[in-house]
Amino acid sequence: MIINAKGPASFAEKYIVRSIWENKFPPGSILPAERELSELIGVTRTTLREVLQRLARDGWLTIQHGKPTRVNNFWETSGLNILETIADLNPEGFPVLVDQLLSARTNVSAIYFRGALRHNPETAVEILARIHGMEDSAEAYAEFDYDLHHTLAFSSGNPLYVLILNGFKGLYSRVGRYYFSSAEARKLAMDFYIELEKLAKRHAYGEVPALMRSYGINSGKMWQKLKDAMPADINQDPHG
């Protein structure tokens, strides 16, 4: 098992998570005792204990006082916060994960974009005004796109959408910078922003779903053209 890590705790965390992912510690099984596991991984028991607590908070493990530590089925117990980890664990499946991420984001964003234009159209108009002086670069578009979604999610009347977006953030920021490196993708996005601004100024929230659906289809087609040339290391968290 080859693991790139920045310290003992990071190594231990990645070792355990990869072992769960590869079914060496299958769901429902009991982890080796603390002493045995710390020797196996090569870290102190104090470090291991901290790592186990963190993995339990993320849903990978169940820790109960006086009982052995049990491995969970993370698909049932974890949240969006493990997206980055899954991307790192499964580089071959990363393009599929991104497809699923973008599909989920498109479907959810149609709800909060409509809500924002209904409840806070002035906020939508204010942030969309930024498009008129925006630099034509991948970084500028990726940053604006995230800010737009974050602002409209918060203004939709249901701030829980912001928490969902936060779960996408790290992964989407890397994919977004790559996607918007295409001039054609930036043009497609700008056309969408301009139309959305028109709707916001007219408070025409009822027309948002059709616009979102059209942009979702077109940007999806654009992504299919771009994804085969994705950089090999785009799945890796630069901070992990």
From Swiss-Prot:
User: Does the keyword Cytoplasm feature in the UniProt annotation?
Assistant: yes
GO BP terms: namely:
fatty acid metabolic process; regulation of fatty acid metabolic process
Q: Does the keyword Transcription apply?
A: yes
- Give the keywords, sorted: Activator, Cytoplasm, DNA-binding, Fatty acid metabolism, Lipid metabolism, Repressor, Transcription, Transcription regulation
Domain named HTH gntR-type is located at 6-74
What would be one Gene Ontology cellular-component term for the protein?
Answer: cytoplasm
From the UniProt record, list the coiled-coil ranges.
Answer: none
* Chief location of this protein within or outside the cell: cytoplasm
Q: Where is the signal peptide?
A: none
Q: Which GO terms describe its molecular function?
A: DNA binding; DNA-binding transcription factor activity; fatty-acyl-CoA binding
DNA-binding stretch(es), residue numbering of this chain: 34-53
Which PROSITE patterns does this chain map to?
HTH_GNTR
Gene3D superfamilies the record matches = GntR ligand-binding domain-like, Winged helix-like DNA-binding domain superfamily/Winged helix DNA-binding domain
Kindly give the InterPro entries that the UniProt entry links to this protein. FA-response_TF_FadR, FadR_C, TF_FadR/GntR_C, Tscrpt_reg_HTH_GntR, WH-like_DNA-bd_sf, WH_DNA-bd_sf
Q: Where in the cell is it found?
A: Cytoplasm
Record's function text: Multifunctional regulator of fatty acid metabolism.
HAMAP family in the record: HTH_FadR
- Known partners and oligomeric status: Homodimer.
The protein depicted here goes by the name Fatty acid metabolism regulator protein
Classification of source organism: Bacteria, Pseudomonadati, Pseudomonadota, Gammaproteobacteria, Alteromonadales
